[in-house]
Amino acid sequence: MVIKAQSPAGFAEEYIIESIWNGRFPPGSILPAERELSELIGVTRTTLREVLQRLARDGWLTIQHGKPTKVNNFWETSGLNILETLARLDHDRVPELIDNLLAVRTNIAAIFIRTAFKHNPGNSLEVLAEKEHVEDNSESFSMLDYDIFRGLAFASGNPIYGLIINGLKGLYTRIGRYYFSNPEARKLALNFYQQLVILCRDQSYDNVMECVRNYGKESGVIWHSMQSTMPSDLSEVYR
């Protein structure tokens, strides 16, 4: 187990999470007593207590007063905030994780972009106008892409869509920094944003879903062509 954390709390958090992931503390099991665990990890009980509370908030653990701390099945109890952690823990499954993330983005974006254009076209066009100021580099495009999807999600009038995109931000933007290092990816994205502008201005709401899904397929082709040269630890790219 290689742990890169600098602080005692960070070390303890990574130790426990990696132990859950690797089966040392499997889902459904009970964590060792606080004193034993603090000695095992090499941190104070106060530090350990703070870490356990944070992990419980993130869905890794269940803490009940007077009862032992239980390890959860994190797939069922955690939220989007653990995506970056999962990418760091299992490099071999990163491509699958990213494919699933992009599929979710495409499926929900097809819905919220149509709604945004229909109910809030002015705000939608303002969001899309950000493309006029983007610099031709991966960092700038990564943030632009995130900001456009996030902005249109909130423009839909349903803030839940925006919160979902917020939850994807960390891993999403790191993926973007690698993906948008490809000039073809940047060109495809600009073309997609322009298509959205036209659909919004023409009130062609029924064509939005097809446009978004086509972009998902075309960007997926580029993404898959880049996987063979993808860094082994994408979650750390340009951190």
From Swiss-Prot:
State the oligomer form and interacting partners: Homodimer.
Give yes or no: UniProt keyword Disulfide bond.
no
Ranges for domain HTH gntR-type: 6-74
PANTHER family on file = FATTY ACID METABOLISM REGULATOR PROTEIN, TRANSCRIPTIONAL REGULATOR, GNTR FAMILY
User: GO:BP terms for this protein?
Assistant: fatty acid metabolic process; regulation of fatty acid metabolic process
Pfam families under this entry? FadR_C, GntR
Provide a GO CC annotation, any one: cytoplasm
| Function according to Swiss-Prot or TrEMBL | Multifunctional regulator of fatty acid metabolism.
Primary location: cytoplasm
User: Which molecular-function annotations from GO does this UniProt entry contain?
Assistant: DNA binding; DNA-binding transcription factor activity; fatty-acyl-CoA binding
Disulfide connectivity for this sequence is: none
Q: Which InterPro entries match?
A: FA-response_TF_FadR, FadR_C, TF_FadR/GntR_C, Tscrpt_reg_HTH_GntR, WH-like_DNA-bd_sf, WH_DNA-bd_sf
> Where does it live in the cell?
Cytoplasm
Note the DNA-binding span(s) on this chain.
34-53
Kindly provide the name given to this protein in its UniProt entry.
Fatty acid metabolism regulator protein
Question: To which species is this protein native?
Answer: Photorhabdus laumondii subsp. laumondii (strain DSM 15139 / CIP 105565 / TT01) (Photorhabdus luminescens subsp. laumondii)
